[in-house]
Amino acid sequence: MPGLLNPDKPAIGRYTRRIDPIRNPYTPGAGSRPPALTGRDDEIEAFRILLARLKLGRPEKSMLITGLRGVGKTVLLNTFEAIAEEQGFRTAKSEITHETDFRPLIARLARRALLAVSPAKRMKERARRAAAVFKAFTLRTPEGLEIGVDVEAMLGRGDSGDLGDDLSDLFLALGEAAAEHETGIVFLLDEVQFLDRAELEALIAALHQVSQRELPLTLAGAGLPQLPALTGTAKSYAERLFRFPTIDRLSEQAARAALELPAEAEGVSYEPQATERILELTEGYPYFLQEYGKHAWTAAAGPTISLDDVERAHDLVQLDLDESFFRVRIGRATKAELAYLAAMASLGDGPYRSGEIAAALGRPGPESVAPTRARLIEKGLIYSPSYGLNEFTVPQFDAFVRRSFPPEAPS
């Protein structure tokens, strides 16, 4: 294949770069779409069915994807966005953070969605009504967003100060406007677990109202594994309103395809032992597959990636993961929280019992470290798969913690 090999390229660091690095197909990065999106067909098909039912005016559960860090939740949301737009839906997407003020955020998304449904100068009756409700809703936000439509705020709709009532008014008005214009609206929210309970209650209540009216408005969201429990705590009927597909590491077949197909498209192949070694090191996690593919490509001295290439790449992959994937997760952790994480990791593979973590810290019982545990869950570093148990939200995080933060001796 022309341009594939570059034999005159000088040695750089530990690698002799002879496969063109510009054509490296692997894309490690937050939310970066992999060149071969494998193992997610069921979730994509479920989303297509959701959209098809909305088009027919039939209620269907919204989707909240759950999974650990690095399994491709954001990639899947981006794929959903593209599918929705291809099918004529209007989309508005954002990411929730610890600092998110939800009311202004949802107002910005609503504005984007409404103007996509109908430009300001061509709004029909329902769209103008939605603009009036939006204007009332934003009276309660500090930003004073404008919609660009000469309408008065619809007092009594969206302006009560109760987020649940106001968001329901806004979503109903948006859904009616979308139906009038023969389209639909898909809100896409990432990191939904960072919403507080009141915000989550309001979002669920608003979607419930929309579903009861069979309006073409839905939510596709993503979050960490604790999300189903959080929604159930916020509203008891959440399980009847949402579908919670859990995505995890890829199957061996899907992982192999995610690794080998992008290289094959560029005329590069893997020795069988090289593929097996990468599958072993990555455990099938999509982000890790992209990292190893990227560095193995760079390490290769020819159009076949060998086991030796993978072993040469291993140290740099580990360094990249430590600095760009693992370490960034703990930037907001306190000394006490780091000690808790180190105690967890010292126990080996999870899940980890709260009592055993307390004992590793030299504390009398789980109650003594419960506040630290709660803060770590709130920050998205650990989650509780069941009562009294704890797990890291990041694959292979235990090994990183053992390398970087050895446990302190119990005092």
Model-derived regions: residue spans:
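Conserved Walker B catalytic segment
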Residues: M154-P225, T233-K235
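A short, basic N-terminal segment
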Residues: M1-K61, M123-R126, P410-S411
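C-terminal leucine-rich, beta-strand-based interaction scaffolds used for sensing/assembly
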Residues: L4, P10-R14, R23, K61, ...
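Conserved catalytic segments around the Walker B and adjacent sensor/switch elements
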Residues: E81-T100
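A short helix-turn-beta junction within AAA+ P-loop NTPase domains corresponding to the substrate/partner-engaging
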Residues: T233-D248
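Walker A/P-loop nucleotide-binding motif
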Residues: P59-T79, L361
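Amphipathic alpha-helical "lid/sensor" segments that cap RecA-like P-loop NTPase cores
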Residues: A255, E260-S324
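Conserved NTP-binding/hydrolysis module of P-loop NTPases
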Residues: E86, D101-R122, R140-L145
